[in-house]
Amino acid sequence: MSEHAPLRALNTFHVEATARWLLSVHTPEALPQALAAPEIADQPLLVLGSGSNVLLAGDPPGCVLCFENRDTAIIAHHADHAIVRAGAGVNWHALVLYSLQQGLSGLENLALIPGTVGACPIQNIGAYGAQVGDFIHVVEAFDRHHQQFVRLDAAACALGYRDSVFKQQPERYLIVAVEFNLPLLCELRLDYAGIREELASMGAELARAADVAQAVINIRQRKLPDPDVLGNAGSFFKNPLLPNEQIAALQASFTDMPVYPGEHAGLGKLSAAWLIEQCGWKGRREGDAGVSPEHALVLVNYGTASGAQLLDFARRIAESVRERYSVILEPEPRIIGAHW
């Protein structure tokens, strides 16, 4: 355990912050004893994987915990699917590649999403028409309220659009591993025209899951900045889900506004990127805080922007969208050290 630990290297925005205590745990079995240390026993706890879905707008209170368990294995084979277990510290993209190498499908649309396996259920990560919740079998976690390890199935995880019980109760559950139910053959999700076009350019009209993954990798590498080069956390805002009546009223005034089906009946989804671009923010930069010129959803740190400066920049983006469209944007990353 380290005291007064710098966190710049542990978040993909590369903002400066300091942890009062930084604790690394390598196995789930070591977790209860580690959490009982007197320095942190009653302190708030922030779990950081790769720090790809947080904005440190200030120093986190209490202790920062890093899980280092990186074991991956197929734990059950069936006729048409397999159960893959991955430790919370496993790199997400590495798991996608592992599943493809084992002849399994389902995760291909989620290739190259930054972060770790332990973080994927929290946000119910999704991209290009797929979300990880469709393939989660069990989440293994330590329940701090009852001081015991628990196994939560997909229903108990309360997975929604960029939401889960882990996001709703961040102080309760510490995810130590995730089990995935992955099919041997899965109907490919090619709803996004960009993926179909990329597959055609690759000469892969009769696509396999590995081809879809490569198409997604190609698209993401073109559109999204590499966080190792330019600080960012991927998409910063959720796509707004609105009642169909409200969307119809908006489309009457803004006829070119794109609309997509929502996850539930009676709801439609707007493109946050389109809203932000229409308000003139795409490519805009103020100091070292800015919006990527390639993708309006991506907030970037060009060098030395603080978390507080990035948060202020994001708030002003959201306020301009609210004023013009009466639509409220919500951030995807968890905001630490400040309120949204």
UniProtKB/Swiss-Prot annotation:
Gene Ontology CC terms, in alphabetical order: cytosol
Enzyme class, UniProt record, top EC level: oxidoreductase
Reactions listed under catalytic activity: UDP-N-acetyl-alpha-D-muramate + NADP(+) = UDP-N-acetyl-3-O-(1-carboxyvinyl)-alpha-D-glucosamine + NADPH + H(+)
Enzyme Commission numbers on file: 1.3.1.98
InterPro entries, per database record: FAD-bd_PCMH, FAD-bd_PCMH-like_sf, FAD-bd_PCMH_sub1, FAD-bd_PCMH_sub2, MurB, MurB_C, MurB_C_sf, Oxid_FAD_bind_N
Active site per database record: 162, 235, 332
Subcellular location: Cytoplasm
Pathways per UniProt: Cell wall biogenesis; peptidoglycan biosynthesis
GO biological process, one term: cell wall organization
Presence of keyword NADP: yes
The entry's keywords: Cell cycle, Cell division, Cell shape, Cell wall biogenesis/degradation, Cytoplasm, FAD, Flavoprotein, NADP, Oxidoreductase, Peptidoglycan synthesis
Superkingdom of origin organism: Bacteria
MF annotations from Gene Ontology: FAD binding; UDP-N-acetylmuramate dehydrogenase activity
Cofactor(s) the protein needs: FAD
Residue span, FAD-binding PCMH-type domain: 14-185
Family per record: Belongs to the MurB family.
Summary of the function given for this chain in its UniProt record: Cell wall formation.
Designated name of the protein: UDP-N-acetylenolpyruvoylglucosamine reductase
Protein's gene: murB
